[in-house]
């Protein structure tokens, strides 16, 4: 038997960082994001040789071993192992499974599109299909969060898991005790078309480790760093304004607050921007972009810009001279999907 699954990556428009503890526990967080037609993919081929093989095709990393109740997390494909460990323990009565798994993603790790969390969701969805697990969207997203953040111990927020699971444009609220509310936004097609037409997605060519940035941000929150906290309060307020703007099709306000959000985000942690990203931003604005920001924790990965559609090619041409490259994309309405072959 073969089971396949995929989960969409997301663009973070506003509020990113307010979904990270301890901020979300103490103040509550708001995030506005949308999924795009770039995915994390998983294939599970069921075997009967009492072996497990994880193959991350895009990273050319492989792990093979005898089927065990639990694999040690030693730095080699820990996310894959962490998911396996949890699934075996929680849903298979501790009985080892035998299979070969292949995974890959349309975006590199460190892209700022939520690629690692989205991969966890895709792999989990594969197991849901195979083992027929009775898990709804909230269950899958929360389980993905627990595996990545608690079991495997990677720092980060919660928005990516929920975006990948639910799909579409979402306004997501985060509160203490792991309370999360996903509000799917009903955005008119003309607004989605206009936003798509007005957006440039630019890969800076620089991968980064979001965990380091998030650790600095968490430290600032715990120490009640006023500059960092005020910036996070501002990001949260901006998310509300941008939600209203996108629902009404007011892209002028949407762009204005996207730019404001980026300025606020840079105050959250010193590693969020750098001279290379600042230069890219400068070139985009000089050639006609209204505003922009980095998607995800910052430090590199993808940047997005809002431009007049008639200037899109001109701005893209200049950005492509900066060492990275623009990427075509479309927004998608569906979240993670799984099927058997």
Swiss-Prot record:
Catalytic residues, chain numbering: 160 (proton acceptor)
Chain residues that bind Mg(2+): 116, 148
Molecular function as annotated in GO: ATP binding; fucokinase activity; metal ion binding
Keywords associated with the record: ATP-binding, Carbohydrate metabolism, Kinase, Magnesium, Metal-binding, Nucleotide-binding, Transferase
Binding residue positions for ATP: 110-116
Site note Transition state stabilizer, residues: 10
EC number: 2.7.1.168
Name by which UniProt lists this protein: D-glycero-alpha-D-manno-heptose 7-phosphate kinase
Family: Belongs to the GHMP kinase family.
Gene3D superfamilies hit by this protein: 3.30.230.120
Pathway assigned to this chain's UniProt record: Nucleotide-sugar biosynthesis; GDP-D-glycero-alpha-D-manno-heptose biosynthesis; GDP-D-glycero-alpha-D-manno-heptose from D-glycero-alpha-D-manno-heptose 7-phosphate: step 1/3; Cell surface structure biogenesis; S-layer biogenesis
Pfam annotation, one family: GHMP_kinases_C
Record carries keyword Membrane: no
Organism lineage: Bacteria, Bacillati, Bacillota, Bacilli, Bacillales
Reactions this protein catalyses: D-glycero-alpha-D-manno-heptose 7-phosphate + ATP = D-glycero-alpha-D-manno-heptose 1,7-bisphosphate + ADP + H(+)
GO BP term, example: GDP-L-fucose salvage
């Amino acid at each position: 038997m073969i089971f396949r699954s995929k989960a969409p990556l997301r663009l973070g428009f506003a509020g990113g960082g307010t979904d990270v503890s301890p901020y979300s526990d103490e103040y509550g967080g708001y995030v506005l994001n949308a999924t795009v037609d770039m995915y994390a993919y998983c294939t599970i081929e069921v075997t009967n040789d009492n072996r497990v093989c994880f193959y991350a095709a895009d990273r050319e990393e492989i792990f093979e071993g005898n089927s065990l109740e639990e694999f040690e997390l030693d730095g080699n494909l820990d996310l894959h192992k962490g998911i396996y460990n949890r699934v075996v323990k929680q849903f298979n009565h501790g009985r080892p499974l035998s299979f070969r798994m292949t995974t890959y993603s349309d975006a590199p790790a460190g892209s700022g599109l939520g690629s690692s969390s989205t991969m966890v969701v895709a792999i989990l969805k594969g197991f849901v299909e195979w083992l027929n697990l009775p898990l709804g969207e909230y269950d899958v997203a929360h389980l993905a969060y627990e595996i990545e953040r608690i079991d495997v111990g990677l720092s980060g927020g919660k928005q990516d898991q929920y975006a990948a699971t639910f799909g579409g444009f979402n306004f997501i609220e985060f509160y203490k005790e792991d309370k999360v509310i996903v509000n799917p936004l009903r955005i008119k097609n003309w607004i989605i078309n206009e936003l798509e037409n007005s957006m440039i997605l630019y890969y800076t060519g620089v991968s980064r480790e979001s965990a380091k940035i998030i650790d600095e941000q968490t430290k600032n929150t715990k120490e009640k760093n006023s500059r960092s906290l005020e910036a996070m309060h501002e990001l949260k307020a901006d998310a509300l304004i941008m939600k209203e703007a996108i629902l009404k099709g007011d892209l002028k306000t949407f762009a204005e607050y996207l730019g404001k959000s980026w300025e606020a985000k840079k105050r959250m942690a010193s590693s969020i921007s750098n001279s290379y990203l600042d230069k890219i931003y400068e070139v985009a604005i000089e050639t006609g972009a209204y505003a922009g920001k980095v998607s995800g924790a910052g430090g590199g990965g993808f940047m997005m810009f809002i431009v007049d559609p008639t200037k899109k090619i001109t701005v893209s041409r200049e950005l492509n001279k900066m060492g990275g490259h623009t990427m075509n994309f479309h927004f998608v309405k569906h979240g993670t999907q799984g099927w058997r072959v």
